[in-house]
């Protein structure tokens, strides 16, 4: 796949299409962070990267380290590890600082602040995301970018939810299956206007992330 069009080409191979509402809300330049919900997994990243890469070429993606092994896209990624080892913390501080510097230099950053795909708490419940990571609040506080909320509509299969209820590692193993079972479908994405009324300086990192999750959850 051609590096520049990796996201578009990957979606084309899968015959996955998307419809974007209010794409004009994406700033054409300047520090910008996209905060998106995470209902599907790999597909969310493919679609949002496709959207943003067709408007701006100064984008990076804050991404789970498990998904950062593809040579074609490594240059666009700031990987994050979700372990508790000392080396994981050091690794994440590096990616966090790179993200902050990228935004301060006028770039844009794609994020999925939950760090985990939405899943059901109980077998027959609707899938929900975990609390968003305070890391996003910290990045925003130190770089002061425009904040663009993004909402994907839909959810993964009942099998994915069922397996996730019992075994989180097995649920992760189903990510590729979930991507492939969405072939030939069209997905809707809502891009909201930049958030202007969030008093970043008066909020903790946790409060910033909680507020942003609430804003995205309410998009319909």
Predicted regions and their residues:
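Membrane-anchoring hydrophobic helices of lipid-metabolizing enzymes
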Residues: 1-35, 45-47, 56, 74-75
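Short, flexible loop segments at the rims of nucleotide/cofactor-binding pockets, characterized by
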Residues: 9-15, 85-90, 125-126
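Gly/Ser/Thr-rich loops at beta-strand to alpha-helix junctions
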Residues: 38-42, 117-118
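Conserved nucleotide-cofactor-binding alpha/beta core module
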Residues: 53, 58-92, 96-99, 103
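Structural motif
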Residues: 33-35, 79, 110-112
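"Short basic amphipathic alpha-helical interaction patches in structured regions
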Residues: 46-52, 125
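Non-catalytic C-terminal accessory region of glycerolipid acyltransferases
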Residues: 93-220
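Short gly/ser/thr-rich secondary-structure transition/capping motifs
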Residues: 14-20, 90-93, 171-173
């Amino acid at each position: 796949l051609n590096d520049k069009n990796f996201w578009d080409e990957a979606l084309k191979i899968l015959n996955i299409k998307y419809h974007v509402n209010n794409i004009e809300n994406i700033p054409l330049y300047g520090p910008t962070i996209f905060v998106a919900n995470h209902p599907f997994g790999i597909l969310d990243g493919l679609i949002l990267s496709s959207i943003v890469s067709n408007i701006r070429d100064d984008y990076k993606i804050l991404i789970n380290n498990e998904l950062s092994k593809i040579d074609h896209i490594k240059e666009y990624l700031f990987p994050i590890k979700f372990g508790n080892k000392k080396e994981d913390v050091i690794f994440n501080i590096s990616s966090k600082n790179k993200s902050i510097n990228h935004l301060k230099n006028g770039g844009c950053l794609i994020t999925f602040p939950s760090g985990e795909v939405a899943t059901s708490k109980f077998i027959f419940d609707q899938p929900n995301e975990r609390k968003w990571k305070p890391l996003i609040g910290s990045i925003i506080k130190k770089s002061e970018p425009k904040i663009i909320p993004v909402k994907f509509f839909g959810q993964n299969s009942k099998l994915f939810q069922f397996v996730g209820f019992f075994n989180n590692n097995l649920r992760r193993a189903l990510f590729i299956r979930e991507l492939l079972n969405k072939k030939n479908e069209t997905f809707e994405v809502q891009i909201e206007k930049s958030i202007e009324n969030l008093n970043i300086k008066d909020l903790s990192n946790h409060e910033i992330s909680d507020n942003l999750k609430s804003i995205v959850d309410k998009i319909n």
